[in-house]
């Protein structure tokens, strides 16, 4: 499973979305058609779970029963494309979500109310990422989050919305549309917090810290950095075990004194045992830290 899919599947298991989220989804992955002298709405995705989620959003908000259709792509990947198809009440949905203008070429940006309200903005960003977002796997060490828009003004509004949350968002125009993107790891982690993907944020941070620890070891090519590398190397097993605990039973399942040591070890892989001991809220001895780290390793080994 890609990291993008992991984030999206976490998002759809959060509490039910709202109209701002649905508006973003429709604007970024929806299209209108005319059949039997009435409008129909099609929302496409390559993820079956997201299709079911969109289905539920529409059904719950408008007491309308959409239809889910699918077809097979003809390219080499042969992915299925799922379409949430709405025949009834389309005009009501468009009017309620203030989307009609965007489909008829009069307005393609983001509603001012969404740009001015924090909660509405968070919901809109969540929907935008579900519909057209992607994150490069943090294991690659090259950090990038992108959201594709058909229209440049929408991409620019999206960047403005992200900037409101203190994110260094930028846009770039392509022949087929425009992309709003983030390239700083800290901005990507903050974005994940904003849209509610807390578990994936923790995973992203753990991978980033582990990569940085490995890079520190690789750069340890002189006497001064060799000592740091030795400390980091000794902590790698513990860091991997802490990540194992986070991914299985969760760090919160540990006693508070073990949680504190675990958080410090992951956050500061280059710290010596003494530095970890000194950094605790209530400092303890080196032997006390070693004792807690051994407990953490044993818990991970028993999983």
Swiss-Prot record:
<keyword id="KW-0132">Cell division</keyword>
<dbReference type="GO" id="GO:0003677">
    <property type="term" value="F:DNA binding"/>
</dbReference>
<keyword id="KW-0131">Cell cycle</keyword>
<comment type="function">
    <text>Involved in cell division and chromosome segregation.</text>
</comment>
<dbReference type="Pfam" id="PF10298">
    <property type="entry name" value="WhiA_N"/>
</dbReference>
<keyword id="KW-0238">DNA-binding</keyword>
<dbReference type="InterPro" id="IPR023054">
    <property type="entry name" value="Sporulation_regulator_WhiA_C"/>
</dbReference>
<dbReference type="InterPro" id="IPR003802">
    <property type="entry name" value="Sporulation_regulator_WhiA"/>
</dbReference>
<dbReference type="GO" id="GO:0043937">
    <property type="term" value="P:regulation of sporulation"/>
</dbReference>
<dbReference type="Pfam" id="PF02650">
    <property type="entry name" value="HTH_WhiA"/>
</dbReference>
<dbReference type="InterPro" id="IPR018478">
    <property type="entry name" value="Sporu_reg_WhiA_N_dom"/>
</dbReference>
<comment type="similarity">
    <text>Belongs to the WhiA family.</text>
</comment>
<dbReference type="GO" id="GO:0051301">
    <property type="term" value="P:cell division"/>
</dbReference>
<dbReference type="Pfam" id="PF14527">
    <property type="entry name" value="LAGLIDADG_WhiA"/>
</dbReference>
<dbReference type="InterPro" id="IPR027434">
    <property type="entry name" value="Homing_endonucl"/>
</dbReference>
<dbReference type="InterPro" id="IPR039518">
    <property type="entry name" value="WhiA_LAGLIDADG_dom"/>
</dbReference>
<feature type="DNA-binding region" description="H-T-H motif">
    <location>
        <begin position="272"/>
        <end position="303"/>
    </location>
</feature>
<protein>
    <recommendedName>
        <fullName>Probable cell division protein WhiA</fullName>
    </recommendedName>
</protein>
